[in-house]
């Protein structure tokens, strides 16, 4: 009887986790030289969600922003940077993320590994040996939704609206190249891209 109860509880727990697990419609990479506070990530997700659609058909629009921390400076925790690299490479190889927000410090720390990764602003793919990354990014303020975004100070947070605004204003936006990725030729995925 005890074994049966345990099996039922285990199966119930598994089914519950499957049913309540939220799958984002969009996962956006935030590649920075600092750790964005949780309130900053949440506000960024709220900013982007009204412009997104229900890609997975579950009746909800969910945007997830994932922060990857990279820097050439000594002020970044080595363990955190290594964990970011592992997550970044896994997400990049699975094509989970197609939109990248990045600051100069993090981008400079990574750019030697990004040949052919992004597409140019006109939608064409960068070649593997291309180094003209400035043609594959636009500034935060050049995106209307971001330019209008007004962060708010949340009670008990160290990061004020002014600090968050400054951090956001340093960001640039790049899109992953679809050519050569696993989404190439998949109509639904290309529509997302």
Give the positions of each predicted feature.
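Acidic, glycine-anchored loop motifs typical of Ca2+
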Residues: 54-65, 72-78
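Short acidic, S/G/P-rich loop/turn micro-motifs used as interaction or catalytic elements
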Residues: 34-39, 105-109
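Short, polar/charged alpha-helical segment
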Residues: 38-62
């Amino acid at each position: 009887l005890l074994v049966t109860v345990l099996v039922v509880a285990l199966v119930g727990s598994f089914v519950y986790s499957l049913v309540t697990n939220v799958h984002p419609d969009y996962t956006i990479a935030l590649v920075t030289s600092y750790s964005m506070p949780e309130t900053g990530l949440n506000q960024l997700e709220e900013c982007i969600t009204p412009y997104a659609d229900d890609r997975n058909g579950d009746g909800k629009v969910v945007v997830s922003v994932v922060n990857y921390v990279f820097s050439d400076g000594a002020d970044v925790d080595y363990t955190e940077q290594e964990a970011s690299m592992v997550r970044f490479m896994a997400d990049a190889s699975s094509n989970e993320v197609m939109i990248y927000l990045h600051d100069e410090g993090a981008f400079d720390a990574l750019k030697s590994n990004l040949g052919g990764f992004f597409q140019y602003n006109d939608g064409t793919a960068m070649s593997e040996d291309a180094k003209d990354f400035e043609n594959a990014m636009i500034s935060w303020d050049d995106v209307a939704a971001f330019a209008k975004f007004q962060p708010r100070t949340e009670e008990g947070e160290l990061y004020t609206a002014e600090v968050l605004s400054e951090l956001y204003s340093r960001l640039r936006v790049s899109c992953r190249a679809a050519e050569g990725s696993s989404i190439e030729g998949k109509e639904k995925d290309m529509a997302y891209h």
